[in-house]
Each structure stands twice: as C-alpha cells, then as structure tokens.
Amino acid sequence: MVYSYSEKKRIRKDFGKRPRVLDIPYLLSIQLDSFKKFTDQDPTGERGFEAAFRSVFPIKSFSGNSELQYVSYKLGEPVFDVKECQIRGVTYSAPLRVKLRMVLYDREAAPGTVKDIKEQEVYMGDIPLMTDNGTFVINGTERVIVSQLHRSPGVFFDHDRGKTHSSGKVLYNARIIPYRGSWLDFEFDPKDALFVRIDRRRKLAASIILRALDYSTQDILDLFFDRVNFKIKKDSLVMDLVADRLRGETASYDIKDAEGTVLVEKGRRITARHIRQLEKTNTTELEVPVEYIAGKISGQDYIDPDTGEVLVSANADISLEDLAKLSMAGIKEISTLYINELDNGAYISDTLRIDSTTNRLEALVEIYRMMRPGEPPTKDAAEALFNNLFFSEERYDLSKVGRMKFNRRLSIDDDEGTGILSKEDIVAVMKNIIAIRNGFDEVDDIDHLGNRRIRSVGEMAENQFRVGLVRVERAVRERLSLGDLNELMPQDLINAKPISAAVKEFFGSSQLSQFMDQNNPLSEVTHKRRISALGPGGLTRERAGFEVRDVHPTHYGRLCPIETPEGPNIGLINSLSTFARTNNYGFLETPYRKVIDGVVTDEVDYLSAIEEGRYVIAQAIVQLDENGRMMDELIACRHKGDSTFMGAADIQYMDVSPQQIISVAASLIPFLEHDDANRALMGANMQRQAVPTLKADKPLVGTGIERTLAVDSGVVVAAKRGGYVDYVDASRIVVKVNEAELTPGEAGIDIYNLTKYTRSNQNTCINQRPCCSVGDPIVRGDVLADGPSTDLGDLALGQNMRIAFMPWNGYNFEDSILISERVAQEDRFTTIHIQELSCIARDTKLGSEEITADIPNVGESALSKLDESGIVYIGAEVKGGDILVGKVTPKGETQLTPEEKLLRAIFGEKASDVKDSSLRVPNSVKGTIIDVQVFTRDGVEKDKRAVEIEEMHIAQAKKDLTEEFQILEDGVIGRARNLLIGAGFDEAQLAAIPRSQLLVQTIDDEVKQTELEQLAEQAEELKADFDKKFEIKRRKITQGDDLAPGVLKIVKVYLAVKRTIQPGDKMAGRHGNKGVISKICPVEDMPYDEKGNPVDIVLNPLGVPSRMNIGQVLEVHMGAAAKGIGNRITEMLEEQRELAELRGYIKQVYELGDEVIQKVDIDSFTDDEILRLAKNLKGGVPIATPAFDGAKEKEIKQMLELAGLPQSGQLTLIDGRTGNEFERKVTVGYMYMLKLNHLVDDKMHARSTGSYSLVTQQPLGGKAQFGGQRFGEMEVWALEAYGAAYTLQEMLTVKSDDVNGRTQMYKNIVDGNHQMQPGMPESFNVLLKEIRSLGINIELDTK
C-alpha cells in the first residue's frame, strides 16, 4: 500500500487476513444523498419539490374558469452561514421561490379559450438546509432527522396464529397498505366467510366490495369457482369427469370405467392410484346416481323457459325436488360449483349468502353507512366516497414501491403501474388469500426486511411539504372561486404560512427530529446512521412485541445485530451496518462478491433482502487459493434465510468483508469475536457516551476503522485538494494547491478556518488543533487538523491505561475501579465542559427589564467581575452564586405618599420599585468565562458592551478577510512572477518593479501576455470580492437581531468548566466492562512491577468470567505488546542506536503475522520518515485487529516476544504498601479506557431547605428542582421495624409537610433552641379533601 507523507507519520499495524475488496462507503451518505434528492431539480418529477408541486398543481377553480399552474422553483441562498446561525439561535435555511402561472379562461367563448395569463415568482417559505455533515441547524441547535423503518406499501398476507378465536383456528387475513390513503383488509372469520374492512372500521362481507365494483353474483361465482357439469338422464346423471378433482373424496357409489369395470368401490377413499387408473382408461364422463347432486351448489340461475320463473338461483343448494323441476322444464344440463373441503373451499359462496346486498347501489350505500355512520346516503355521495377511497389519484397512492411490491407478491410480471387500485387488483388479492386458505400459498413474514423499507430525511421532508401544499391548495381553490380575478396576481392567492408551519413543525418537533448526540465523533455518526421503527406511521413501544424487536436473518449486512439501546426501545432502534445502503425503492441492500464456478471475482453486486433469498451466499472467511478459488469441498453458506453447507460450484455470491454484518460502533471493538453479544452491545453503546479528553490518545489496540470514522464524521479538517502547507496557526491552515488540481483562472490557495473552543449539544468542548507543519506535502483527504477525540486523524475516545487484573483491598468489589493518582495528575481524563447561560431582558406590563450594574441591595464585591454594562468580563473565574449578568425587573407600583413622591422627584431614587433578577452561576459550578454574546432587538439602543463586542467582531472579520485576501493575492502575484521570469525577466528587474505594477507589465509572448492579463483580472476580482465580503460581514454584525416578541435583549455567557477524574465518575472499556471509580490511590501505594513501573488502574478479575467478554483480556495482552515495542523503540532512540537497526526492528514489527494482507515497505522510507515514524511510535505501536478477522493467539505471543515480554502476558507485581511480591503472577497490560458522560459532579446534590410542592407541601424531587430524597413507604417500614419512633415522626412531619412545624423548627434552630413540636402533615389534609370529593363527609375529631 502507498502511504502519503502525513499517513507515514504513524502507521497502524494491521492483522487483517482478508483483502479489502470494497472500501467502507461514506458513512453519512444515507442522510446527505436523501436530502440531495429532495432539494435537487428533478426533471422527471418523481421526487423532491418537483414531485410535490406536480402532485398538487394545477389547482382549478370549482367553476373551471381559472387555474393556477406550476412552472418551476428555485432555492435561494441562506442569509447566514452555519456558524452564524448557531450563534444567533436561528434556523439555517434558504427561501423557496416558485414561479406560478395563473390562467383565466373566457366564459363566453369556446371551452378552453384563454382570456388572460399572469406569471409571477411567489415566495413559499424557508426550507431548512442540511449542513455538510448531515445535520440541520434549527433555532441555533444542531438536530438530526433519524431515518424510519416502516412497513412497505403493498399487499401483505398474514394470520392471527390462532389467537383470535377460542377454538385456536388459524384465521388468515390480507392487507393492502398504500403510501397515502385508506387501508383495505380482507379477513376470514371462524366460519370461513371472507370479510372486508376499510380503515379498520366495521367489517362487511367481502362480496359487497365486489358488488360495488359492478360484479353480479354470477360474475363473482365465475371469478372464483370452477364448474362441474352434469347431463340429466332419466334415472341418473352423467358428470363430466376431471379425475384430479376426485382426490381425497369418499366414493358414494361404485366408480366404473367405460367397460363397466369397477375401479373404486363404494365407501372407499379415492387415492392418487385410483386417479392414475382413471386417467389411463381415458374416462371423460362418469355416470352418478341422482342423489349425488343433492347439496351441491348451483353455478347459475336456471329459469323456466315458459314462465320465466327462477327455478334454481345461482349459489343455491340443489335438492332432488329442484332437479325434478329442472327436468320437467326441459333443462338437460346443469353446472354446479366445484367445491372440495381439502383444497377448494366454498368461502366466497358462503360469503355471498351472508351478503344482504343484491346490486351495486345497495353495496355502495352499505359502504357509505359504514364509513359515515349517521349521514343519510345519496347515490352521488356514495359513489364519490367509494371512488375517492381507492380510485382517486389525489386521495390514494400506492407509490412506485407499493406497486412493485403489490405486483411481485401477486406474480404480475410488470413492476410498474398506476398508484391507484383497479378491479383486477382487488380480485387478485381475494384470489390469493383464498389460495392461502386452500393451502396453495404461504403467508408473509412481516419482519422480513423485504417488507420493511427505510424512509429517510428527504422523503419525510417531501411528505411534510406536500401536507403544507395541500392546505394551501384548499385556500387557493376557494380564492379562485371568489371575487374578481382580473386584478389578482398569483402572489395574492398564495399564503406561504401553512407550508412554513408544516415544514417547521416537522424539523422542530417531530419525533424523528432529534437533538444531535454530540458527545464525540462516534455518537454523531451513529446518530445519523440510526434507523428507528418508532415515530409517525411507525410502531409504538407499547404495541411492539418480541418478533419485531428480534434479530431477523435478513438483518445480515443491513442492520447491526449488536447495536441497539437497552431498555424499552430495544430492537426498535437499530443502526445501519457498515456497508449497507438504501436502493431506489428505499429497501436496504448490502454488497456481495460474485462467485462463478467456485472462483470469487472482484465484481460487487448490491442485493436487497428480497433478491438475496434467491441466491446461495458464502461468508467472507472462506479459504481461497491465490487464484480466488474456494479450497473447501463443503462451504458454510446461507440460502433462503437458513444456514447450510453446499459445494463450491453451488455458491453464487460471497460476503465482501467479515465486518459486513456489524455497525460502525460495534466494528470499533477489537477482538469483538471473543465477547458475549450482550456485553458487545453495552460496549458499542458506551463508546458513544465517552467524553473527549483534554489530550486525545489514539487506541493502541484498534480495528483499523478509526481513521475512516474520524474523517467521515467531519470533526477533523481533511484536505480538499493536494498541495503543500503554506501557513499554519491555531485558527487557520493555508494550503498551496498543486498545479495539476487547479481549475483555470483561480488563485490556487485553499484556506481552512478551524473551530475553537465552542460548545457542543452535550456541553462538551469542540476544538480543532492543526496536526501539520509548514512545508508538509499534502494529498487530497489528508488530515490537516484534529478535532475533539481525534489524534493524528484517528478516532481517540479515551486513554491507554496500564491495567492489572487483581483484587486490591475490596476497592474493586462489584466492578469498582481503583485508579492511580498519577492518572489525575497527568490530566489523562481531564475534560472541558462548556455551559451556555442566558439572561433575557423582556418588556413587561410594569415596564422594561434592564441589564445594568446598578443592582439594589448588592455589595460592591459581588459586582467586582461585572463591567459598567452589568456583564461579566471574559476570563473571569466564577463560582456558584456569582452574578454573571446584572438585571433588574420593575416591581408592582405601590401607592406613594406625597412626601415620598417629592423625595423621588428630587433624588431620582428608584431602588425601591425594582427587584434583582440577575443571572447567577448555578450552585456547585466553578469555571472560567470564555465568551459573551449580546443580542439587541432592532430599534433598541445597544449598550457599551454590545458595541465593544460588535467592534471586536468587525475588527476580527476584517483581520481574517485581509489575511485571506493577502494570501490569495500573494498566490496571484507569485504566479505572475513565475510568468514574468519565464518571459525573460530576471530577479533583479522584478525586485525593482513595485508589487502593484507586476500585473500590468507587457510581454512579447502573446500567450503569456493573455495569462498575465487574466491574473490581473483575477486580482481585481479578489479585491472586489474582499470588499463585498467585508461589507456583507459588517452588515450582518451590526444589524439588529430578530428576537422573540417581547424580548429586548439577550446576553449569552459561555462558562468553561475543567473536570478532573474523581471517585464516583463512571469509566468503561470497549467490551461492556463498566465501573465506578472507588478510590484514587497514591502512586506509591499502587502495585508495581520488578522494574519499578506502577500500574495505572486495578480491575477486578471476577468481572471477566461470568460476563464472557474475553476480548478485554486479549486486548490487554496485545496492548502490553504494543506498548512494549514502543518502549524498545524509545530505548533505541535514547541510546542513539544505528538507524539501520531501528529500521530493521520496525520492519520486523510490520512484517509479523501469518497471511497478513497489510504490506508496509519500510525499506522505501527515507531516514527522516523512519525517524518521524519512530518518534510517533514511542508511545506504542498502534495495532488494528478487525472484527472477525483479527489477530490470533499465536500472533499475540509473537508480538509479546518481539516486545521482550513473557508470552503468558503475566508479570510478578509488588505491593506498593508492603514491598512484598503478590503470591501469583498478575495479568498486566494496556487497555483503552473511556470516561463516560455520567460524572459525579452532575449527580452530586444535597438539600437543606428549598421549594415545596404546592398541593402536598412536600419537598420536590431531583437535582434540577433542588429537591430532597424520597422517604418512601418501604423506608417507613424500616424505621418502624427498628422502633425508631421519634426519628419516624420527624421524617413524616417537620422534615416533610408539616408546614407550621417546619417553620417553627427553622426559627428554633436559628435561636439555638433544638426542640420541635410536630403538627398535622399537609398530606393528611389532602387525603381528607380527596375523600370529601367522593361525596363522603369525613370530619377529623381532634379531642
């Protein structure tokens, strides 16, 4: 593999044995691609805005004299960029402008004669835009729209598993689910009649819907039944014989062939052998006794030719009397329905008998009564309702997916068709459910991923937009029908509010629009790749059973079987597998390598769950020879959802990668294959809760996906184009672009501005640090700057800690963790948390609130950190209770005496009518002010601090833009100099020419002269562009802010809190091994090895066997080896050994392992590159051991040997307190530990006195309310059991809800009198009141 300059800085040793056939696809593509499809112009009109507009427009007036037509749309540019929107608390959105055409028709002239056409561009609201990282900024906060897994539109057949009826009989049902519109259900009842339901309403006989579709009884019988024809003879009947139909029946007469030989005796069951005999004799007719027809069902109406009387009606049972009547009337042939209890039941016949309707109108009225109970039906209303239900494109849409699924399920060849139902569709569904009931077909598996599809952000936004458009359509249609249209323009007809409201509601408060989990880069990526079965149109937690939540065979390679939340949402919220993607229909598909005659090719096909069932698919771990041929005779594979073994020649596809089945979070766990699945689930989930540490540290033992994840998450800065680094500082990186990658006529400079110390959604700190130096060569995709939790472009969620598995004085009992003081001293787990505190000055009824330093009854010391505007200084160190923003609120006016009025007039004394409502630092918070933002309403005068901040921002913007302009101009001037040197100028001449004159020189060479003129134009454009950018920036900074109604000013203060690790904090490894820190132990007391190196953390060995997460032990061994090799390299560097020896050792490391695919050509590295690599490997050689394809035990031992460590991975440790050796060797090594966002500082809380509940007068609960600890029923029992009567009395009265008692006790304590008089608890009074509210008079007798 070829490594770029920056990749050579540190190379991860990879133990993967399988070649990478397919790179991991861009991890955020599910979000970005979906939204791109929504916003991009689509000429076909199948999706996005275009589809929504075309489905609603043209809007015609009721009279038909006018219509509003859609022409085109365009999305404008956003007013603010993403960062500005976050600071200002506004939505990152762009205005949608639509060109509409209003056409007026001439009433008097011929139909369709146009009288007038008006075209106009109309504003239709703001549409939130997606950022480059797949998020939305809504009201200043980053949100993610989670994709939804819902039931695909189409037709589904199912049964009730025998649960509906007490007999346990299985009742089948069918359901047609459209994308938009009413559901249509067919279901059998216990008596085997078929019923229909529309929108889950009251059920009707299924034949009613057929009658409504204009089928007569005769038509219905012809559709669903074959016929048996009889010729009427004098004493017998002759039946047309179809031999197959007799199978399973008991012969009620002797069955003879044409010669009269008895083939089946009377009373015998007719078997397949009898059928074969009958077929051999070519018997086509069979004479049967007259009694045979009794009870058969007539296939049509039989009418007396003379009188016109119906002798036997269709679907009636035929009796012997009926047969005599038919014979008398001269009818020679009759046909009956072919019904067989075994495989051809009389379901439709039975249904027709319970159907009270006889014609179409009656059926329509019956449907109308069911849908609109209580309304009087008319013919037109009933017809309109029925047509609108399933046959109107406005009200009903199966969608392309639904039609494809519908047609495939019913074996209709064409995958395309209309979005509405046809008569044939409904009949086909009924035939299919009858076939299932007869045993010829099977029900569907609704949990199969072929029956569930993904609805991503673009599709959901489009649906919401269409909802808004439909609301507008109603209003437009009414306006078109009213008033004089000659004066109106399209703008006057359209009100954009309903559209904006629908879109805003979706992005702001939909269940699937979630506050982005921004703990670390992994949590961001997994949130964007989350797939939820909940949400509108999905399941609910309460109704979801085990089957829906369970892992299904079709999840393979599509949804991760590991990563899902623990708790009520388990199985309902899933994560996309690493290589999965959605196809055009929204079904998940996963890639497979094609196998031809047992040889694996590099051709990759993406298969959906439906297609996958048709093929035989082998796993990625199959043994292949050098030509790609499968070596084993029998190969483990999957076919039709089952695991089996087949020969190599039968295999059609093979997995692309062993990591294919798991998600990104799960694939970050090394040695995942050695962990129990439940613990792996916890490990995957806990990595998302890791807080970014102050100093990121790459994992020594990783899986090789760390770099991909860090780059795709967008938290690092990756190079857009190749070149070399021209300038670096803490906030900006400038890259000079390679000539080959330039577009003609551009400056050739890429500027990357870095994000500094901003707050994330979870209050963690987002900060980017450059990781390149001036002069470094760069290729596209190289990491230029690290973000939070990244180290040289690798994801780094935690720290590598030296671990010992041993008990230590009970401090690691029950998963507790003992850590060394050194860990805290070195700030290994120190994290920065940034809190945003807001102070809002409102306009109240009594007057405006004011932000000021002049606060009543506050001492000088409390104001020491405020400036004259009453706002805290940046850099001030504050603690709980300190004032951050001084604010006074007007109090209600009190009646003043004339003397007071006079004094007030003279001295301007205002203190008495305002109260202090300043913003203070919350209790238990201590930190540093790092930023202050002031937002002032348009038209309100800005205070001094706001003006200062404004000026500072303008100066900063000017400085940034000037530097940017300077860099770009230098690029242009540099290219001009090169051009002039090429044209014959020498350095001395150029030095004499002023910089401004370089671009206006004349050259003899015409081509070069043209190039120089182009550069001069470019420089002019840059200058104009700079002025324009600066003016826009200045205007944005100085303009007033659009604040909520009644808000005059908002001050936002950002407070940075540094948190070191301490007892009570939660830590975890990556294998689900979590625990709470019990003690921080002095370094000298920690166990140490024979070389005197103490361990950092002591874990309990009992945490491993019962949890079956052995991966952590292997990680510790491999970590020890990786660190040991790093120590050997450090020694070599310190001892200044020969470079050849260092190169040889590093080469040994990278070449270690059997069948390892990674090839690192260390010999091709220059000496400088070897030294730089060695310096970066001092802390340990990073290892990649991919999931299901990782390092083997033998390789771990080889690594330990190379590091000079015992192959057992165990060392003799010495007790730091006694100096004695522990009696056994201890497993010591390096494990990657995470500090989780469950910090004791956020949970620690104590109450003295505080707020009380209004009704019960008991203290509130929870830290947020400054509440108390609940003393519940069981705690009362405990005190009763101890006989602690006085303590109990205290708990139930003065410490809880005895209002007078607690007030008195407070006074007594102040006075130094430690006595109490308990009174009546308020909750007893509440109980009395509640009993009285039931109408029971209850009096308390206090005698």
From Swiss-Prot:
The keyword ATP-binding does not apply. PROSITE patterns: RNA_POL_BETA. Its EC number is 2.7.7.6. Signal peptide: none annotated. Keywords: DNA-directed RNA polymerase, Nucleotidyltransferase, Transcription, Transferase. One of its GO terms (molecular function) is DNA binding. It is an enzyme of class 2 (transferase). It catalyses: RNA(n) + a ribonucleoside 5'-triphosphate = RNA(n+1) + diphosphate. CDD domains: RNA_pol_B_RPB2 (cd00653). One of its GO terms (cellular component) is DNA-directed RNA polymerase complex. The keyword Transferase applies. GO terms for biological process: DNA-templated transcription. DNA-dependent RNA polymerase catalyzes the transcription of DNA into RNA using the four ribonucleoside triphosphates as substrates. The RNAP catalytic core consists of 2 alpha, 1 beta, 1 beta' and 1 omega subunit. When a sigma factor is associated with the core the holoenzyme is formed, which can initiate transcription. PANTHER family: DNA-DIRECTED RNA POLYMERASE I SUBUNIT 2. Belongs to the RNA polymerase beta chain family. This is DNA-directed RNA polymerase subunit beta. It comes from Shewanella pealeana (strain ATCC 700345 / ANG-SQ1). The lineage of its organism: Bacteria, Pseudomonadati, Pseudomonadota, Gammaproteobacteria, Alteromonadales. The gene is rpoB.
